[in-house]
């Protein structure tokens, strides 16, 4: 699917919802709006700021304009310079700061108050704490007994599409992108005339947990929005895993369709919501997902 197709899907879905699709310029990668490149080192510089990310560490460059253009074109760690065989101090400090940020978002918990404020039902997997979640991924693929009963009692049965939110490996991905992806996603699915299940939050969930959820609720399509494993300095990336008629015993990873890198510096959440709506409609039409879908 190329960019023109994505933009057409966004326009179509947003139009059916009575909203105006954002102009392509509004959905540009964050790198195009980064701060002006900085060449001097400073102990007072915030290592997580746009100014620090735009820093150029190459001393006395032959073509400074080329470095400036390269620096503005990507968020990758380029133009950092060297001090002999070693990285420069500021480049090393920023690397360590980004690494710390990524570790923090893996270890943080989604606050219970935040879940309640969104009006979401909260259930959990068989995991009881973050340490167990990181060391026993198999237990994160199954709901606890209380969660199974809660879903049967409080969720819509046999929906066309069931939307599930889970913390995964990034708390920030959920809390930062939630407001921009779930409301337009739910509105788009309903506008398409689909029976939509009760959205809920799964704490300590892994991707395969959507198979059990789909089986319990009898959902035709299950959409899981889950926090991605964070990269260096990028802790807000969300993934969507969609699967048709999942079953615990027979569904394999090739049966899932994944849309990744959903955040303001990647695929904007509102745009992703429109693409997911179109994906769900095609899954229901073809009665397939993953590699079984007709491209």
Curated annotation (Swiss-Prot):
Superkingdom in the source lineage: Bacteria
Enzyme class: lyase
Catalytic reactions on record: ethanolamine = acetaldehyde + NH4(+)
Principal location: other
Positions of adenosylcob(III)alamin binding: 207, 228, 258
GO cellular component: ethanolamine ammonia-lyase complex; ethanolamine degradation polyhedral organelle
GO terms, biological process: amino acid metabolic process; ethanolamine catabolic process
Pathway: Amine and polyamine degradation; ethanolamine degradation
Details of cofactor binding: Binds between the large and small subunits.
Enzyme Commission number(s): 4.3.1.7
Keywords linked to the UniProt accession: Bacterial microcompartment, Cobalamin, Cobalt, Lyase
Pfam families tied to this protein: EutC
Lyase as UniProt keyword: yes
Compartments (UniProt record): Bacterial microcompartment
Entry similarity comment: Belongs to the EutC family.
Stated role: Catalyzes the deamination of various vicinal amino-alcohols to oxo compounds. Allows this organism to utilize ethanolamine as the sole source of nitrogen and carbon in the presence of external vitamin B12.
Quaternary data: The basic unit is a heterodimer which dimerizes to form tetramers. The heterotetramers trimerize; 6 large subunits form a core ring with 6 small subunits projecting outwards.
Name recorded for this polypeptide: Ethanolamine ammonia-lyase small subunit
Species per Swiss-Prot/TrEMBL record: Escherichia coli (strain 55989 / EAEC)
